[in-house]
Design a protein with these regions (language model features):
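Conserved phosphotransfer cores of two-component systems
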Residues: 5
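Active-site adenylate/phosphate-handling loop in enzymes that bind or generate adenylated species
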Residues: 13-16, 26, 202
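Catalytic cores of enzyme domains
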Residues: 19-196, 207
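Ferredoxin-type iron-sulfur electron-transfer modules in oxidoreductases and energy-metabolism complexes
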Residues: 162-190, 203-243
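Short, non-ligating residues that shape and space the ligands of small metal-coordination modules
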Residues: 199
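Conserved small/polar residues in nucleotide/adenosyl-binding loops
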Residues: 247-252
């Protein structure tokens, strides 16, 4: 959008990517909790995406020249580091991620597959909009691997039309609909890579085999189902962050 459709920038979500959200919180909230200067914290992200290296280096994601994310490596690089260090994962004990930034929900897990971001958003948006508990957590109609697909979600009597695309060629088609005033959608999810982040350029090579992407997506949905918390707004640490740091009167508006 920045390069080819700059006139549509105001239509984009104002939320940063998960990588940049984490970096900013780690070097503000977490640094304050530890009582250390942000420059003494090094944030390393492990990502499925090659473009995250560039994203982490963008000057708008830095404070006084100190980046929110210092180093971004992709999945295959991590695998090489593990092999280089002769780490045998089968021999490692299970452990939880560090808190407070290690707690996650099923909604966060499905971000990795096409349709997952908008499904996670719908789980929260439904409850915030209707003030009712979501009767069915899984939005099956948003799932699949078709390059372009659409669905209408019932928000307690209000139909919300969703468009989904993965792959840049498919994304362009939906964006051109918006540009031409022909888009029927209230919200659109776009992922650059086939299948979403599961097919990212930094992931183990799938070599265009859709069955590999299906299995990766199925694994994410299984992980989502196994979670106790499956909606983003149910995460107690996210709630605490909004209460003490992120919530403002502007956000309420």
């Amino acid at each position: 959008v920045e390069q080819h459709f700059p006139e549509l920038l105001d239509n984009l979500s104002t939320a940063k990517s998960p990588q940049q959200m984490f970096g900013a919180i780690a070097k503000s909230y977490f640094a304050e909790k530890l009582g250390v200067d942000r420059k003494r914290i090094v944030v390393v992200s492990i990502m499925p995406c090659l473009a995250k290296k560039y994203e982490a280096s963008r000057p708008e994601f830095a404070v006084d020249g100190n980046p929110d994310v210092d180093i971004s490596i992709y999945t295959r690089e991590l695998a090489r580091l593990i092999r280089y260090a002769n780490i045998n994962f089968a021999e490692l004990p299970d452990s939880d991620f560090d808190r407070p930034l290690g707690e996650s929900t099923g909604a966060g897990v499905i971000f990795g597959t096409t349709g997952g971001v908008i499904e996670a958003a719908c789980r929260t948006a439904y409850e915030l909009y209707t003030k009712k508990t979501l009767p069915k957590i899984d939005f099956e109609e948003l799932r699949g691997l078709e390059g372009i697909r659409s669905a209408t979600i019932d928000f307690d009597g209000t139909p919300i039309k969703i468009g989904i695309a993965h792959g840049l060629g498919n994304a362009r088609k939906l964006i051109e609909q918006v540009q031409n005033g022909m888009s029927p959608y209230h919200a659109i999810e776009v992922m650059a890579c086939p299948g979403g982040c599961i097919g990212g350029g930094g992931q183990p090579f799938h070599r265009g085999r859709m069955e590999v992407l299906r299995k990766r997506a199925a694994a994410l949905y299984q992980e989502d189902r196994s979670k106790t918390l499956r909606k983003s707004h149910e995460n107690p640490y996210i709630q605490a962050l909004y209460a003490c740091l992120l919530y403002t009167s502007d956000a309420a508006d």
